[in-house]
Amino acid sequence: MFRRLLIATLIGILAALAVAAFRHAMQLLEWIFLSNDTGSLVNAAEGLSPWRRLITPALGGLAAGLLLWGWQKMNQQRPHAPTDYMEALQTDGQFDVGASLVKSLASLLVVVSGSAIGREGAMILLAALAASSFARRFTPREEWKLWIASGAAAGMAGAYHAPLAGSLFIAEILFGTLMLASLGPVVVSAVVALLTTHVLNGSDSLLYTVHLTVDLYAREYVMIVSTGLVAGLWGPLLMWLMTASHNSFLRLKLSPPWQLALGGLIVGLLSLLTPTVWGNGYSVVQSFLLSPPLFSLIGGIFACKILAVLASSGSGAPGGVFTPTLFVGLSIGMFLGRIWGFWLPGSDEIAILLGLAGMATLLAATTHAPIMSTLMICEMTGEYQLLPGLLIACVVASVLSRTLRHDSIYRQHAAEH
């Protein structure tokens, strides 16, 4: 057991280093190509001329597509191992190292160029790949899946500062159940990854800064649970829209480079309306939580952002769908909060409260993992007083969503990509 805990610690450190390497590579490329050192792609887009804002996502998509297409052509004849940590866990615990690195590099290109896709997909993949490489060299074959799972959880902890949610992500989504025998090393890896990330970043700050002073009474719980009901309907709709977008791109019968370029061009066109469509939505989520926008502005940004997410995901851009889902959930929750605010005092507080509820419940509705979704929002924001209400709302959203659509967003995304 102590041997496993030691290995889990080492994997946590490796995973944090992998996440940090991807993050620093992003910052370097943003500085080189976009002259941006703020870490915010929205700020980068605002500083570009309209024509550069238009073509940059298209060029990034084209470059990523050429990279993936070229690698595929070069390796047509050799057998393929998984390039996805979920698939690796469901098979024999092995990765195609070269293809996984190429996929991560392609993800880096589309993320840096502004596509509305999450960076966490590549971060978790690299963390799991680092864990797999270590495990194959130093551990018996029957343990490989455990260490890949530990690496994936540690990658999520490093990316989102949420070790408990990262561990439950593995337990609820990948293992399908809370397996206590396997959860110990997974939790250790996740916590060590978070601590290592804090050391590398020089701070232990939360991922999102929130100033919420509202007291929770029966009225607030009713609003939170009602947000869960709405998210339970929106989750299947969002997944259906992603599938429809993916099928629409396939019907065009374009080669991968041109398909990804078209997706990037759509994002570029939308960014002419509002630069907030660039990137995974992290900086916009933070600005909304600090200063909730007006009703009409939420609706306009939401419409443009969801079209950008559909274009990026549907075109096959390699990356995650986790953070974009958080943005969509925040917008839905704040939209509902503004509606409640027509009749109730403290409209900004209500908007922030239901924005957080929207993030948690739409995440639960799309992942079918209510416990993970609840803890994720609490760990990212530090608002643990919301836990009871969010847990009820997330269960409601997950049950309703699963009733309407059996597959989660991760199973759907894996099947399409």
Swiss-Prot record:
Keyword field: Cell inner membrane, Cell membrane, Chloride, Chloride channel, Ion channel, Ion transport, Membrane, Transmembrane, Transmembrane helix, Transport, Voltage-gated channel
Task: Give the matching SUPFAM superfamilies.
Answer: Clc chloride channel
Q: Which residues lie on this side of the membrane: Periplasmic?
A: 26-53, 167-172, 243-257, 309-315, 360-379
Q: What is one Pfam family matched by this protein?
A: Voltage_CLC
In terms of domain of life, where is this protein from?
Answer: Bacteria
Entry keyword annotation includes Membrane: yes
**UniProt cross-references to Gene3D superfamilies, sorted A to Z:** Clc chloride channel
Biological process GO annotation list?
Answer: response to acidic pH
Please list the residue ranges that the record places on the Cytoplasmic side of the membrane: 1-4, 75-145, 196-221, 279-287, 337-338, 401-417
The UniProt entry's sequence similarity note says: Belongs to the chloride channel (TC 2.A.49) family. ClcB subfamily.
Q: What is this protein called?
A: Voltage-gated ClC-type chloride channel ClcB
Source organism per entry reads Salmonella typhi
Taxonomically, what lineage is the organism? Bacteria, Pseudomonadati, Pseudomonadota, Gammaproteobacteria, Enterobacterales
What is the gene name? clcB
